[in-house]
Amino acid sequence: MSEALNELASYIREARGALVAGSEVRYGELTLTTKAESLIALLTFLRDDVQCGFVSFIDVCGVDYPQRPDRFDVVYHLLSPRQNQRIRVKVATGENEPVPSITSVYPGADWFEREAYDMYGILFTGHPDLRRILTDYGFEGYPLRKDFPLTGFVEVRYDNEAKRVVYEPVELKQEFRNFDFLSPWEGTEYVLPGDEKAKSR
């Protein structure tokens, strides 16, 4: 399988080398890296070229690397039923650097791009309706970013007296603690079967 993927990578580099910044075969899948300005041209080639035939769009997802200057990877997964192969295309982008929407190439990417915007704050230029799709109206922040607090910022509940949904600041019932369960000094005390017999001797 990896031999066929290496041949495909060589073919793509020969045909459209200027559009591909890097390629690697890992875990039985070919990954191409490209720049945002080359994305539409590369995906159009992968879809329309007879040797490639990646006509099935599977997914768009975001990956957050807060320590990098280009914080996000936008990752596209495609399938070629003709060749029975999958391919992954990655584009790195910063917090305020938009990526072109691929809805002109794969119309099914519409809601996936909206989800990446809603969860990570990744901007897509040329998207027909880029607005939140999973979070509530007026939601602040992007919940899948690694710097988003686990508790969130607001608590949503139904108020029986007001007969409506209310938003309140998060109120923790106890102080937030970070346990290191692997540490013999901080972990919880475990009572194992038979421990009580050993203490009575």
From Swiss-Prot:
GO MF annotation: an example: NADH:ubiquinone reductase (non-electrogenic) activity
Disulfide bonds: none
SUPFAM superfamilies listed in its UniProt record: Nqo5-like
GO cellular component, one term: plasma membrane
Keyword line: Cell inner membrane, Cell membrane, Membrane, NAD, Quinone, Translocase, Transport, Ubiquinone
Assigned protein family: Belongs to the complex I 30 kDa subunit family.
Name of the protein this chain belongs to: NADH-quinone oxidoreductase subunit C
Native source organism of the sequence: Sinorhizobium medicae (strain WSM419) (Ensifer medicae)
Record lineage: Bacteria, Pseudomonadati, Pseudomonadota, Alphaproteobacteria, Hyphomicrobiales
